[in-house]
Amino acid sequence: MPAGEKLVSLFEPHADIIVKGGRAVQYGHKLNLVTGKSGLILDVVVEAGNPADAERFLPMLDRQIARRGAPPRQTAADGGYASRDNLKPAKARGVQDVAFHKKCGIAVADMVKSQWVYRRLRNFRAGIEAGISVFKRAYGGARCIWRGLDHFKAYIWSAVVAHNLMLFARLKSP
């Protein structure tokens, strides 16, 4: 029986089985987050099922291009998104530097213009992970107590708004 057809919760029938390499199986929904250099969460997508991260890189990039009207100059992504099949189309869409945390056989020179840029983007991505940790722990992004898929999505978006408002409040005026 395919995972999408399995009922894993009587109370939350929309819950999915989330399997990530070497970790314990989780039940819920996979999220894809996009953040900017300020730390603001710019976009969140609640995925149906458990799609591979690599399959979601280009659709998430396309969402940002559609929203901004232009591609980002640089992007940094988790190792799960790394593949040549993602690198070449991202470059073709106008992204100058694409840094994946895991290289997966891709040369740094193919991803970015220099080793220095790669290190900067890799370190930036580590900061994103810290922001995601704060989002999960301080704003409820790890566990939703609202029932139903639509309520889950509303809960996540309300957590994003709370997270972003706190970042705005912490900004110092010039």
Residue ranges of model-derived segments:
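Residues immediately flanking
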Residues: 37, 79, 102, 163-165
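Residue-level preference for alpha-helix termini and adjacent loops
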Residues: 9, 16-17, 24-26, 30, ...
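An internal, acidic/charged active-site-proximal segment
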Residues: 68-123
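Basic, amphipathic alpha-helical segments enriched in Lys/Arg and hydrophobic/aromatic residues
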Residues: 116-174
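Polybasic low-complexity intrinsically disordered regions
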Residues: 1-74, 79, 87-89
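Composition- and surface-driven signal marking solvent-exposed, interaction-prone regions
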Residues: 45-47, 87-92, 146-150, 172-174
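Generic, well-ordered alpha-helical scaffold segments in large soluble proteins
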Residues: 36, 60-67, 93, 131-134, ...
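Short acidic (Asp/Glu) and glycine-rich catalytic loops that position anionic groups and cofactors
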Residues: 35-42, 69-70, 105-114, 136-142
